[in-house]
Amino acid sequence: MILTRRTLLASTAALIAAPAFADAPGEVAPTIRRLSPKLDHIIPPNAKVEVIAQNIKWAEGPVWVKDGGFLLFSDPPANIMRRWSAKDGVSIFMTPSGTAGLDPKLVREAGSNGLAMDHHGRLLIANSGGGSIDRVDLKTRQRTTLVSKYDGKRLSSCNDMAVAKSGAIYFTDPPYGFAQGDASPLKEAKQNGVYRFVEGQPLQLVDGSLTRPNGIALSPDDKRLFVSNSDEKDRKLVYYDLGSDGMPTGPAKLFLDASTLKGPGNPDGMKIAADGTMFCSSPGGMWILTPAGEKLGLIEDGAPIANCCFGEDGRTLFLTSNTRVLRLRLGIDGWAA
């Protein structure tokens, strides 16, 4: 989540539950800008972007729950997690989604942010308000805090996650949940960190040098970790080559310089398809990149697109876009077979 986007948040409103929506007056219809013919096998030429939910305060962190066939997504400032399915439309799934009872003068995003699934079908929550990574058993709704401190100091406002094949959880911890950011009296950690968590082991700091680590994703072979930096003064996407221990073998390397990109938003969430195609939130919308960083196209919605995930049969891309959620059919597999 990016603080400079707050001017784009709509006022709190009830979410309209319906499978699709016409664009509200003044809203821009989502479009696909094609920059290369290579995009056609990724997003078919006749593909259309649907609006499946709207009137959200700030849509974030989508994840598809295979066992149940539904989408979950966060609304961090509203402290709500919502559910969507083609059959039932939109409903409230969890409230509070993060931590209740926090002082709004100190915490501006008390709810969940990034969501993921572990390899046992349990929901993982980047708890922005609680400064923790939580796990929820979807059958019992039992919630467990997995990690909330590094080196004895509380984490800030956990933002996004990527789960490795080994089960390790990589996550980012910027100060976006705090009303005063780095200057917050609640902030204990010196760094805005990228971390690696393995249950039963000490939390590992992957990198503490990024000013605003945000979106995070692993390559299909788990050999590279990608992280977006959302600082308006240093907008970029970097990557780390990972060793057999799951930690970087060297410093971060630049993958995408986003400082020259135009349009709403900053570098944010991302997902990587089974063939290595990258869907990366950056200024302008959701960019589609090759594994080498070539720009193939851009999904635009007239507002920042915070994050995305694959869902349904693995060939649907869901996008959380400011006050609404979008759906787009793909021509490639998001998940490995």
Go through the PLM ranges and name each one:
Residues 7-24:
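N-terminal export signals
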Residues 23-337:
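Sequence-structural signature of mature extracellular/luminal beta-sheet repeat domains
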